[in-house]
Amino acid sequence: MINYRHLFFVVFLFFYGCVETLISVTIIPDGRYHVKIESQGDERDIKDKDFNLPSSSNWSVEEFQKQDIDSDETIFVRSAESLLSGRNFLGDNGQLGSLRYPISVEKKKGIFSDTYTLIQIFEGRNIDKKYPMLSKSLLNPGNNKLENRVQTEIIMYCLRRSMKDVSTDQNVEALLQERILNHFNGVFFKAEEENKLFEILNEGDEEKVEFLNLPEKLVRTNFKPFVDLLPRNFIDNCINRMRDYLHEANVTIQLNDDTFKFVGTLPGVVFSSNADSISSDSLWWIFDLKDFMNESFTIEAASVVYYPQKIQQTIVLGALVILIVLFFIAKRKAKS
């Protein structure tokens, strides 16, 4: 019999949705910069909140639909734009695991020129460290042996981190934490051997399969042997904290099929950048989750605006000073 839950999870993991996000940044001479972020794709995929567009009062937000010319499918579009200055912490909504992409633009005034520096960072997800099986699966889709263990790995990571966080306040010894983790590992190992792993993780929920859910009943059941050894409310606090870490994992998985394009326009002459390509006066970067799976992905560019008139004035002034000095030297020599 086909395990449809397993099949859906695998399909979701590797083919779920497709959202393309274009980030356009134009720096104006006074050092401020116009930012427009536009995501387009399936409406559900855009609203899954793996990539958060700014929505504060200083941003103009728009949502609309359009028809794809080739496929005649409906494309959902959400955009946000604003005029900013300095550094802005985009994507930081205060929720653990949200993709943050801070941006900074700096203008340095000089005597003969002004320099502009643009930096935007897509913070790394640290997948290799957090979920090594998921990392391998994303890089090698179709490996069933790895795919079968991804969900267990993520749940165990969430449990481990939540127990560590809660134990800091409730003083649960590290040895007891390890005993609990070993117990859960044993439960998952046995379920995998009996081909019941996805059943116990999904707890009979046929509908809610779009993302990883917390198997709360399973967690509470397997905490029972340790209830008398744990502080009051420890289990409840752990479960609440697990939801935060599970959100982080869901964001990472949902980012798997997202693509990003960044176009930057700077005043003057660009003298440094790590752009993928240059078109007219614009710098282009194209990237996806693989570029920030572990380490952060950084967009960097710098330009300079020279002021020829100031340079000419300085040269003329310098020449006049030299001539005056030479004149007085010559005059003094003539007198002597």
Question: What is the meaning of each model-derived region?
Answer:
Residues 19-76:
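Start-of-domain marker
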Residues 1-22, 323-336:
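Bacterial Sec-dependent N-terminal signal peptides
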Residues 62-320, 328:
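Mature, soluble, non-transmembrane domains
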Residues 13-18, 51-58, 260, 264-266:
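Short, solvent-exposed secondary-structure boundary motifs
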Residues 3, 15, 32, 305-306:
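Intrinsically disordered, low-complexity N-terminal regions enriched in serine/proline/glycine
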Residues 1, 55, 280-281:
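Acidic, low-complexity intrinsically disordered regions
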